[in-house]
Amino acid sequence: GLLRRTHGGAVANDRLLVETPYRAKRHEHVRQKQAIAGAAVDLIKPGESVILDAGSTTYFIATLLKSRPPDGLTVVTSDICILYELADCPSITLIGTGGTVQQGVYAMIGSHVESFLRTIRADRAFIGAHAIDMETGLMSPNPEKASIKALLCAAASNTHLVVDSSKFGIGSL
């Protein structure tokens, strides 16, 4: 088959699902990602703790949060670019998950991230996906990232999937 089920989603058995480098993803579907970011930021209330998954859509959420941060906001992320974007924003308490940096993708992965995520609770998590299949669910080309996404969801009281239209139908070839 094209996919192999894992805890929290599915991963590709072959090369159909290949992770696009972060720098390229940030320039794809920009208008959709900006609209998604606006809707996401509107959900965040002052004093909340928010988890931002690693990815280009969540990066757009971070850039918008930087320009209009709610009072008392705490952001947790495994994304190096989001950490850098929010690092000089004094009104946001910023927490990085630690872990091993995935080259070209700038996501922190590994057992350090998983251990950390098991110890926290947040009001909201904004989760991206490489692909979505209506039967299988969220898909990732990387089993470690699939596991981390499941832990991100478990750590939050409210989970919001933030994906643009390009994520649908990738695994159906």
Task: Kindly label every feature range from the protein language model.
Residues 53-54, 128:
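Short, well-ordered coil/turn residues at beta-beta hairpins
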Residues 1-51, 63-70, 87-91:
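HTH-adjacent hinge/linker in prokaryotic transcriptional regulators
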Residues 50, 56-59:
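Gly/Ser/Thr-rich loops at beta-strand to alpha-helix junctions
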Residues 72-76, 94:
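Short beta-strand element of Class I
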Residues 5, 80-173:
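Conserved phosphate- and dinucleotide-binding cores of soluble alpha/beta proteins
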Residues 33-41, 58-59, 114, 146:
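Short, well-ordered alpha-helical scaffold segments within catalytic/effector domains
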